[in-house]
Amino acid sequence: MYFVRLLRVANMTCIINKNKFDESSYNKFFSYLLEGNRRQCISFINDCIESGLGLKEIYILLLQRALHDIGDLWQKNVVSVAQEHLATAIIQRLMMFIYQKQALPSPNGFKVLIACPGNELHEIGARMVADFFEIHGFDVKFVGSNIPVRDVVGQIKAFSPDLIGVSCTMAFNLHEIKNVIDAVRETNANVKVFVGGYAFNKNPGLYKIAGADFYAADAEDALAKAKSFLLERGAANELSC
């Protein structure tokens, strides 16, 4: 069922339905982002929050789309590396701002480790996934980008996660993903591993070659599929939606 909200965002009426921001509102935000205007971006996000939007909606409907769009513009040489990096830094700041305003639920008893493998410097998508799991009651360890295999193994031994998520943006790092997953299997054959990121979005079937249990298109998809795997273990009464 589709829902519609009339919001006052950045001094204009913004219509939010299940799938997207009103184009004029999105374009306004995206122009602030391209300009590197962090103050206006924060003001826009604050208005969204005050109007009733939560982390899930803002991450998926606004920030995720903006990241994809800025990446496309960079690939087409429309924006510079500096502009792309500035936009990414602003979005990371916005994510911190949004996260701090969320009320965390009671723990559901499950642990998730999220990492980006060696040579993978793009971590913002993985951070979104980590935040999604945390606001749904998971105990999350997000260890960031460029993590050596030995350190992933060390975290598995110390943390004993039920799930491990590994992100890969650049296709040339896929072998690093496989190295991580091979090490995970040797360390704990029972833990479930999922993968995501731009490299897998372009070719979802690669998750099988990498040895993962499933591929997730985004944070929302990762959460839904993770719950499905855990439900198979008889955890229905422990997971909250």
Enumerate the predicted regions with their spans:
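Cofactor-cradling patches in redox/metallo enzymes
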Residues: F132-E134, F142, I147-G205
